Each structure stands twice: as C-alpha cells, then as structure tokens.
Amino acid sequence: EMLKGIAEGAKETRSPAIVSVSEGAFAYTDENFVKGLYESARKSYKDVPLFLHLDHGKSFEMCKKAVDLNFDSVMIDGSALPFEENVLVTKKVVDYAHAHGVLVEAELGVLRGIEDNVSAEKNVYTNPESAEEFVRRTGCDTLAVAIGTSHGAYKFSGEATLRFDILSEIEKRLPNYPLVLHGASSVPQKYVEVINKFGGEVTGAKGVDENLLKKACREHNIFKINTDTDLRLAYISTVRKHLAKNPNNIDLRKFNTLAIEEIKNLVADKNRCFNNINRI
C-alpha cells in the first residue's frame, strides 16, 4: 500500500521517488518479498523512476545484503559509533558498494527519537569540520546531517527550529555536496486530530514546519528529505476513520484503497513543497 501510494503520488507530479526499506522491513517480511514487490512496482510504473534504498543499515553485512539484492543505494548508519569507527565501517561499505555500482549514504551526528531500529535520547549536532573530514576519508556519496530534526512523531516540545547556521557551515566546507535530512516529517495536524478522534492517542505530536523544510531544500544543499512518519500518519488516520464509520467492514481492500489515495495525495503535496515536480 505504501509503495503504491508513493508511486501514484510521484506519477501525479512527474517526479522520481526514493523508496526506503528499513532493517525492520526485512525482519517483517523477507528479502525476496521486498525485492519482488519493488520489481513489480517498476514494471507497473515504467514512467516513474523508482529507486530502492536501504535506510539505516547498521552493519556492513546488512548493507552488503542490500547491494547483493541490487538496491540502487544503501545507507550505512554508524552515527552512534565513535568517529574513527564510523569512518572505518562507512569506508568498507563504500568500497564494496561502489564496486557494484551502488551509491552510499552515511550519517554523522545523532538524531533524537525512536523510529524502527533507530533510537537516541538526545540530538548531537553534526560538526562541520568533522563532516568535511568524514566525506573526504570515506568517499560516501551523500551525508545525513543532524541540525535539529528528530525521528518519530514527537519532534519538538517547544518552538520548532533548525540550525541553519550549522548547515551553512557544512556547505562552505562541502560545496555542492548532496546532504540529507532524516526525521523531517511535518506531522500534519489533520492526521493527528483524526487519529485521536477515532480511538488513537498521539496527543502532542509535533513535526517540522514545512517552511523550514522548504528553506532547507530550496536555499541549501538538502537533496533528500525523509518523511516516513507522515506516511504512517496518513495511512493510520484513514484506516481508523473508515473502520470507526464502517464497523461491519471486513474487506481490507476498501480501507486500503482509501489509504493509498491519501498517501498519493500526501506524496504529491510533498513533491510540490520541495519543488520536486516535472522532473521526468
């Protein structure tokens, strides 16, 4: 359902899409199912460039598995490791992935919050000088940076702010280098309200202001923005509302069709917000 909604949204705005698969997704199903689902989507949406990406690979072995499955790109997340260990594991992944024509995203700095297999209690902002050294020594193709975003639906207790001063300093040291923002869901309140109204409990959920995200991708070198939480909220709010109003329904296709449509609309809106339209 998620994949179909993403592909439909990308088709509507004539945009390429990066479809991220987490270690949790591999644990939930299996590698053959993941690969088969993606290959089927590419056949069904031949006019939409869909790129398969491993999100938050925690080890060389996990990244190697994704490379061997012909993923287009992998992320090695050594952000919780000491700097030198992060460099070593990232360089090992880069060497293997590049030999197979696969791009590598790495991460430096720590994002607070919980999402899938990623958990941290506080933010550790990316050090610009360390970022420059890290990219030079590892040869990673993109770098996820920590400038104030966080994983999950509860990103800010007060005013939502991002450290654009840190981002600008990183860009001075890495001119024209593609950077990534994780934990950048805006947590639309319309979804939060529907979930809470129909039996859920996500009170206090708060995301990143979309105006800040617009600035990040339109005025800075942020080329990839991760918004998984928003997709989850779109799906869950639609399903909860439908089942509450149709308690006798046992046909999954009825509420999944509605959820796919909502995901499609959300993805299309994100593409417009991030100026990712008419690119194919």
Which stretches of residues belong to each language-model region?
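Extended, intrinsically disordered, low-complexity segments
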Residues: S237-I280
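Shared catalytic-loop signature of beta/alpha-barrel
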Residues: V19, F26-D30, L213-K214, F223-N246, ...
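Hydrophobic alpha-helical scaffolding
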Residues: A27, V124, V202-K206, I225, ...
